[in-house]
Each structure stands twice: as C-alpha cells, then as structure tokens.
C-alpha cells in the first residue's frame, strides 16, 4: 500500500494549438529540487483530467486537461543525467476510473526516482493540442531526505 507523506501539485501549461511533435517542458520546481543538504525522491505521480480537476489552482482562468488530449501526450523524465523514462503514455499516470478517460487500473509506482531534473523533463505531442490552453495537473508524491552528518541522510 502506498502512503503519502509529502505531496506537491505541479501544473504543466499547454499552449493552445501546440503542434504535433512539440515538447512542453516543466518550469523549475524549487520544492522538488535536490540541494546540498536535501534529497528529493519521487515515489509516484498521478495525472488528473478535467472531470476531477476543472481549473488551474494557480490561475483559475485556465481549464484542466480534457480527456480527449490524453492519447496525444507521452511523458519523458530526465533522471540521473539521462532520459531514463522516455515517451511514457500519459494514460499510465491516470489512476482515477472515469468513463470519459483511459486509466491504469493496476499501476506501478516509480522506482524511487532520485535526481529527477524537472527542467529537462517534458510532454511530447503526437498530434496538435486542442484550440484552448489548458493545464496538465501532476500529483507528485515524494520523500525528502535531509543531511544529518557527512554521510547520513534522514527522512524529514
């Protein structure tokens, strides 16, 4: 059973009419960045469609992702200096059963992704996005380790 101790909601804004083949990169996410005395380990991610996430929490004028966009998007995550998770279909990250959207019934948590570089991670489109700007909301579950001694790390 997964237990959530730390959670961060991250929104990836998709411009209207994003062309096929385009990549939309994440912005810097300070809360989820490793620092000299802090390590972040991502344990799981979820994505929410507009039926469960209607509008952006940052600016409620941008709508949530329509279910029809899901088949157009694949995710690539840059971990430990390489694109270690490449072109994962977005549907793999949807864990809520919704008649309008594909989802993964028995999902597999990530293998504790440490050193995930959000600035180099992106969504790639195999078809043009809708004519309306929207956000893809990612629910990030993670562990934060703080340095206690020269070689000792403890969960914070």
Task: Locate the predicted segments by residue.
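Beta-strand-centric surfaces of beta-sandwich/beta-rich domains
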Residues: 1-156
